[in-house]
Amino acid sequence: MVVGSEFNNTADVDVVAILLTLLNADYFVIKQRLVSACFTKRIKWYFIYAIALLSLFSSRNTVCAPY
């Protein structure tokens, strides 16, 4: 289960991304959290980081998704 959260600083983005990855969270949940964090903080680095992470999950889910 993923609980909604507010990002208080840029370190929160990394922590949430790692936790969601370890918990094998849904691809769209990860997309929503990371992209919204990027736009609220307006940090180019995290936007690039989010795209890279989402690309990884997108290719993985295409091959392994049971539904």
From Swiss-Prot:
Membrane-spanning parts: 13-30, 45-64
- Subcellular location(s) per record: Membrane
State the UniProt keywords alphabetically: Membrane, Transmembrane, Transmembrane helix
Does the keyword field hold Transmembrane helix? yes
Q: Name one GO cellular component term.
A: membrane
| Name of protein | Uncharacterized protein YIL134C-A
Q: Note whether Transmembrane occurs among the keywords.
A: yes
Lipid bilayer topology:
Multi-pass membrane protein
**What domain of life is recorded for the organism?**
Eukaryota
Q: Which organism is it from?
A: Saccharomyces cerevisiae (strain ATCC 204508 / S288c)
